[in-house]
Amino acid sequence: MGFSRIRCNIDGMSENQAPTEKAAETVAEFNRVPSILSIQSHVSYGHVGNSAAVFTLQRAGFEVWPVHTVDFSNHTGYGQWRGPMIPATDVREVIKGIDELGKLDDVDAIISGYQGGSDIADVIIEAVALAKQRNPKAIYSCDPVMGNAKSGCHVSDDIPPLLRDKVVPVADVITPNQFELGYLTGREVSDLESTIAAAHAAREMGPEAVLVTSVLRPERKEGEIEMLAVNGSGAWLVATPYLPLKRNGSGDVAAALFAGNLLRGRGIDGDLSVALGNTAASIFELLKVTHESGSGELELVRAQEAYVHPEQRFEVTKVG
C-alpha cells in the first residue's frame, strides 16, 4: 500500500480530512494553562489570603484571577491594621465584569477564604453558580476560615453559621483545620478515628472531598504534624516534621496548592494521595525556609521552588 492510501480516524477526523476543529480544540485544551478565580482577603504587607495564594499558584503554573474581599495594610494577627472591607456590591461587580468579558467560561476552579463581611457569602455562592453554569467542569474549593483551637474564632459571630449553612453545602472541596471541622460538623474532633468520621459528616453536607490541613492527635508520633484527605474513595494521611512556629497564611497556601494539585491530578473523587503528598511537601518546605530565616511572615518568595519541585517527599498512607 502506498503512503497516499494510509487512512486514520482521530477524534472526529474523517478518513481523508485534515485535522478538524474538534481535534484542534483538543490540542488547545491539552496545552491550556488552568485558571483559578480566587475570592479572598488581600494585605499589602505579609502573605495571607490572596497575598499568599496568588503568587503561589502562579509559580505552580496556574492563571489566577484575584478578587479581594478586604484590602488591609496587614493581617489582623498584628492587633492593628488599616484599610477597608470591600462591600459585597463591589465584589459582585468585579466578578460580573469578568463574566461580561466571557472569561468565566475558562475558569477551572474557584477558591475562597477569609470573607470579611457577612454579605460576601451570597456573592461567593452566586459566583460559584455562575461559573459552573459557564463551565460545568469547574470545581469550588472553600477554605472555611474561622479560627483555631488555640485562639478560638477570629471572625465575626455571624460568619461561622453562614459558612456551615450556606457556603459549605455548595462546595466540592473544603479545607478546614481540626477546629473548623469540629464546628462545621458539631462533632468533637480529637483522634484519627473521630477526625475521619467528622470529615465524612462534612461530606454529607455537600462537599465531595475534605482536606484537614493540620491534624494534632494524641496518638501521633512525637515531633510530627499531619494532614488528612478524605473523599468517597477513602482517607489518606501524611505526616511531616513539626516545626515550632505558627505563621499566618500557611493554611491559605495549603488550600490553594491542594486545589491546584486536584486540578492537575486525578480529580476530587479519586485517589487523593498524590494531591495530598504534593501539598504537604510544599507546605513543609515553605515553613522550614521560614523557620530557618527567622522571619515573622511566610518566606513565600524565597521558598518558591517548593511549589514546583519540593526537595523532600513524605509517605502517604491510606487509613480508611
Where are these regions (language model features)?
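Glycine-rich phosphate/adenosyl-contacting loop at the front of the ribokinase-like
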Residues: 3-86, 314-320
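Charged C-terminal helix
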Residues: 17, 23, 270-320
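Glycine-rich, highly charged phosphate/nucleotide-binding loops
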Residues: 83-100
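Membrane helix-loop-helix hairpins that form the core translocation module of multi-pass transporters
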Residues: 108-130, 139-148
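A short helix->loop->beta-strand "cap" motif at the edges of active sites that frequently abuts
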Residues: 131-139, 206-208
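Conserved phosphate/ATP/ADP-binding segment of small-molecule kinases
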Residues: 155-235, 245, 264-273
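Short glycine/threonine-rich catalytic loop with a Thr-x-Gly-x-Asp
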Residues: 241-258
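Short glycine/serine- and small hydrophobic-enriched flexible loop segments
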Residues: 256-264, 281, 285
